[in-house]
Amino acid sequence: MESPHEHQQNLLLSRIITNVEKLNEAIMVMNKTLQEINIQNMNIELVAQMFKNYQSNVLFHLEATDNLKDPA
């Protein structure tokens, strides 16, 4: 015959296993979302670097052609 403590422990263990499975699913969803965010951040970083390089090239060109004027 099974002891009441063993039965109670089995119920608790079952609840723990269920909760850990739910937690794992939530973490997997969060990791997928973070991966998508990181991909978008890489795209934003690339565009920002392109604009920075463009600004540097424009400044170089304006200085080289003596067309750089002080801001009004």
UniProtKB/Swiss-Prot annotation:
Source species taxonomy: Eukaryota, Fungi, Dikarya, Ascomycota, Pezizomycotina
Gene transcribed to yield this protein: DAD4
Record's protein name: DASH complex subunit DAD4
Family: Belongs to the DASH complex DAD4 family.
Cellular compartment(s): Nucleus; Cytoplasm, Cytoskeleton, Spindle; Chromosome, Centromere, Kinetochore
GO BP annotations, alphabetical order: attachment of spindle microtubules to kinetochore; cell division
Organism whose genome encodes this protein: Chaetomium thermophilum (strain DSM 1495 / CBS 144.50 / IMI 039719)
Assembly with partners or alone: Component of the DASH complex consisting of ASK1, DAD1, DAD2, DAD3, DAD4, DAM1, DUO1, HSK3, SPC19 and SPC34, with a stoichiometry of one copy of each subunit per complex. Multiple DASH complexes oligomerize to form a ring that encircles spindle microtubules and organizes the rod-like NDC80 complexes of the outer kinetochore. DASH complex oligomerization strengthens microtubule attachments. On cytoplasmic microtubules, DASH complexes appear to form patches instead of rings.
Gene Ontology, cellular component aspect: cytoplasm; DASH complex; microtubule; mitotic spindle
Role summary: Component of the DASH complex that connects microtubules with kinetochores and couples microtubule depolymerisation to chromosome movement; it is involved in retrieving kinetochores to the spindle poles before their re-orientation on the spindle in early mitosis and allows microtubule depolymerization to pull chromosomes apart and resist detachment during anaphase.
Keywords (A to Z) from UniProt: Cell cycle, Cell division, Centromere, Chromosome, Cytoplasm, Cytoskeleton, Kinetochore, Microtubule, Mitosis, Nucleus
